[in-house]
Amino acid sequence: MIGASPNATRPSYFVFSYLRTRGRYDVSPINPTTAAIDGVKSYPSLAAYAAERGVPDIVDVFRRPDQLMPIVEEAIAIGAPAIWFQYGVINEEAIKRADEAGLDVVVDRCIKVESARFDGGLAVGGLNTQLITSRRRQASRTPGGGLR
């Protein structure tokens, strides 16, 4: 997971922790600014990860859109089969490059949400709306002016 943070208030930490607790995912942080997150070794780059552990099945990305092209190039260089850009991580040039290189590309989706949906976890929380989006819904107002 590129951009995984040791800060428990960051979305990348929440997703990292969730996937680890599922028991069937082997998630490693890629973050050059930290040695480990929750006792899991962090790698400074995808290349460093691949040299030690092999090619990951999915490269999950929590970085700003302007930082995606070098990440895509590194994913291509190590032979990654898939790249997943989290909610709001959209860079059309990087997406096109990854797609043209033959990677499976997932854009504007959260791997935690999709995992929970796949496992039936959204239904347990009453959240199985079948609508997955990064856009906030506008609150509707009642005729009296209150929020619904």
Predicted regions and their residues:
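A charged, well-structured terminal subsegment
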Residues: 114-148
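NAD(P)-binding Rossmann-fold cofactor-contacting core
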Residues: 5-10, 17-38
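Short acidic, glycine/proline-enriched helix-loop-strand junctions
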Residues: 53-54, 92-115
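ADP-ribose/adenylate-binding Rossmann-like module
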Residues: 75-98
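Glycine-rich, highly charged phosphate/nucleotide-binding loops
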Residues: 37-69
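Short acidic/polar active-site loop segments enriched in Thr and Asp
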Residues: 25, 57, 81-82
